[in-house]
């Protein structure tokens, strides 16, 4: 690591300045909102002014003690602090150029992704078991802590595990590869195991509070849909499942917008049983339907290759062309295949 590079151990509250954007909800006290109301908002998951500005009025009214008149006042003051009107394409382009990408550990994979996992958006990884989804997540949990000039995000990682597949020993191996201190890398990963769909949603509220306090560059959910498949069964609960899933995805989108973090979600696949199956080479589709498809900015399809090799295909992206890349899973995480 270069002498000017930031040590992951030093990533913390001191680095969470105005440069990183989100304003704490307490900022509203300067504009006539009482400290008790700000505290109630924070307890309900609204830890930043941005989170309030992005929230519909009917949601604010659910906060205990917030009347309609008070909600109007809070939203009006939040709108003054957070620009949400029209801007020129030139200004938007300049903001887009400030976004960074987090390296995957594979040059082949980074090449088709334009540098790695984009911050400020949601990237979905879907595929069968043993296609490298969780291994890629483990590698990203370390590379997000690297300095920007090494392909990192200079921030911590928040990891929500729904399948009990998180293994710290994998992080230590990846850390050694990149010359990072293993203990410090583990300290910079905030881990939580989700046990049901409601708990998964509650963890997202806790994530918002943590991101308001310290600098995070990556949020991982591995996997997005496994608990929904067990908590909601049959067609009778399909509508309730999709509504709950949509609420969770909206929370992910809000965190990506507020804090500029890269959000990476993994997804399982299910076999297609319609008439089109006979004409399709790969008769499997990701779970979650259109709700997940529309929420994900970039969708990556992973499949097995020869030996430890895996193939990633860009299935959907607003700015990247469809392309394939071959990568491998090694003891030190995601790597390029060795010929």
Curated annotation (Swiss-Prot):
UniProt-listed CDD domains: Rad51
Main subcellular location: nucleus
Database matches in InterPro entries: AAA+_ATPase (IPR003593), DNA_recomb/repair_Rad51 (IPR011941), DNA_recomb/repair_Rad51_C (IPR013632), DNA_recomb/repair_RecA-like (IPR016467), DNA_repair_Rad51/TF_NusA_a-hlx (IPR010995), P-loop_NTPase (IPR027417), RecA_ATP-bd (IPR020588), RecA_monomer-monomer_interface (IPR020587)
The organism's place on the tree of life at top rank: Eukaryota
UniProt keyword annotations, A-Z: ATP-binding, DNA damage, DNA recombination, DNA repair, Nucleotide-binding, Nucleus
GO CC term, one of those recorded: site of double-strand break
Regions that span the bilayer: none
Functional summary from the UniProt entry: Required both for recombination and for the repair of DNA damage caused by X-rays.
Name this polypeptide is given: DNA repair protein RAD51
Gene source species: Mycosarcoma maydis
Organism ancestry: Eukaryota, Fungi, Dikarya, Basidiomycota, Ustilaginomycotina
Gene (name only): RAD51
